[in-house]
Amino acid sequence: MSSQPKPRVAVVFGGRSSEHAISCVTAAGVLAALDGDVYDVVPIGITTTGRWVLVEDPARFELTDGALPEVPATGTPVGLPLDVDTKALQRLGGAPGAPALAELGEVDVVLPLLHGPFGEDGTLQGLLELSDTRYVGSGVLASAAGMDKQVMKLLLAGQGLPVGPWTSFRARRWDTDRDGVVAEVEALGYPVFVKPARAGSSIGITRVTSREGLAAAVAEAVSHDPKVVVEAALVGREIECGVLEDLDGGEPLTSLPGEVEVVGGHDFYDFEAKYLDSGNVRLTCPADLPDDVVAAVRRTAVRVFEAMGAEGLARVDLFVDPARGEDGIVVNEINTMPGFTPFSMYPRMWAATGVDYPELVHRLIQLALRRPTGLR
């Protein structure tokens, strides 16, 4: 009796965004966790210029000594299936005399581990939808809305979820109506956080305490995105909660909440604190919160997940004042492809809840394999 073939999983990582290196680090952890006896794994890196290549040595992408990895352009170029009737990856080019285009075998599901624009924002998801390819995570709309802090806040507020005070503007308005923008920002009250609307990993974010620091902060944000979001600084503990779709189709599952505390060296939980200077950050899983607040955080995380139409997984970030119970919860954002390195908060929260890293990856792939293609 022949054995059932192993599902073939294309793990896609890297990409054109400023979060390229973090995506590579995520991929190193996920590829090490995938069980080769269960899945046939195809690692595909996307270079910083958008070239898709087969990757031969995924271990090279681990974060060591603070050095940030990058997908090399030297691998075999690959492309997605040519139409919806075949699921075969395509090898582009080859040795002299070899066919210019050759099939590399069918893929059952894509695990996209890209962070930021051109990957997490619905663009890659749309490409996979065009080729009728199953993939892990949220679809085009939820991915795009979750990446755009302005759109996300509008959607969440429209569903009655608590969102902190904020404003948004584009670079051209900063150039033509600076006084108007400054007035809107100062109505929030200092300090504020100035952010690129469509970036993650705390890239391009500045904490501003007075008008004098505003121009430099806007310039930093605009260097990453012409759309800028400014948020009032909120009082409360920085709490995160993982959400995972239920394999049996029930209500989304939630992890025990975790807490982020910056204990020195940084004004807030910025890129360096997240990835390069963990000694000044305390990540606590589970967070030390009263039971009723934990329950309220988990309920809120599910509401956010469903309001955004998210699928597969997400991390919901909140500010919590435990003394005020459920009234002390404010939603900061949703991440539809959260940091997924073995030391990232999302897998750590699930480990504290009883789902270890390999099992978490396995569940996500199984969810994608069961999900229909096309409109759903």
Swiss-Prot record:
Catalytic EC class: ligase
Keyword check for ATP-binding: yes
Protein residues bound to ATP: 185-240
E.C. code: 6.3.2.4
Gene Ontology terms, MF aspect: ATP binding; D-alanine-D-alanine ligase activity; metal ion binding
Signal peptide range: none
Protein name: D-alanine--D-alanine ligase
Organism for this UniProt entry: Kineococcus radiotolerans (strain ATCC BAA-149 / DSM 14245 / SRS30216)
Gene behind this protein: ddl
